[in-house]
């Protein structure tokens, strides 16, 4: 499972990832989350460009054949883009969870990124989650 952890991004304990791209942060869910969820049937993003999001608050839901889960913002900021491709093709998350981003935002406090788990810490978290 640790091999499914990308080193170019940070993670939350709820299994969202945050990748810094210039002055923006792109957000999605990890391979561990996808494996736990199973086949994704619906991605519902409740925010739109221009909205302000607070770290730890839900920005949408993801539904699979097994369950419905909230999607949480890893950092606070202003929504710049939403991946509308996921409306019609939620299976993109199963196919490539690190390519199928969900939201892009401009962080209001870049230090929040440093508070997220780096890839090594996230891999350690997954070891305990697997037991």
Model-predicted regions and their roles:
Residues 1-58, 96-131:
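Acidic, low-complexity mobile loops and tails
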Residues 20, 64-65, 74, 108:
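A short, compositionally biased micro-patch
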Residues 24, 76-78:
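Structural motif
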